[in-house]
Amino acid sequence: MAHKKGASSSRNGRDSNAQRLGVKRFGGQFVKAGEIIVRQRGTHFHPGELVGRGKDDTLFALSAGHVQFGHRRGRRVVNVVEQVAAPAA
């Protein structure tokens, strides 16, 4: 392999695409079942009540409700709180 630059060659010109990670639905926002709440690498956030975890550590809602962030045993957890239907009068 040549270690000197040949005519009109360059060592630059490569860049990877962004992974678009992060929180997609914030605390208090309404989500439907299956909606992605957090895209992450590793378990920065852990799944709580009514939240599932995909094989790439993505957190998603298992049921419709409002997103709630909190702590449990020193871990940051994401919960989905179901809406309680108002009693019919």
Curated annotation (Swiss-Prot):
Pfam family, one: Ribosomal_L27
Polar residues compositional bias, start-end: 7-19
InterPro entries recorded: Ribosomal_bL27, Ribosomal_bL27_CS
GO function terms (MF aspect): structural constituent of ribosome
Region (Disordered) residue spans: 1-21
One GO term describing the cellular component: cytosolic large ribosomal subunit
Source taxon at top rank: Bacteria
Family membership: Belongs to the bacterial ribosomal protein bL27 family.
Full protein name: Large ribosomal subunit protein bL27
Record lineage: Bacteria, Bacillati, Actinomycetota, Actinomycetes, Frankiales
Gene it is expressed from: rpmA
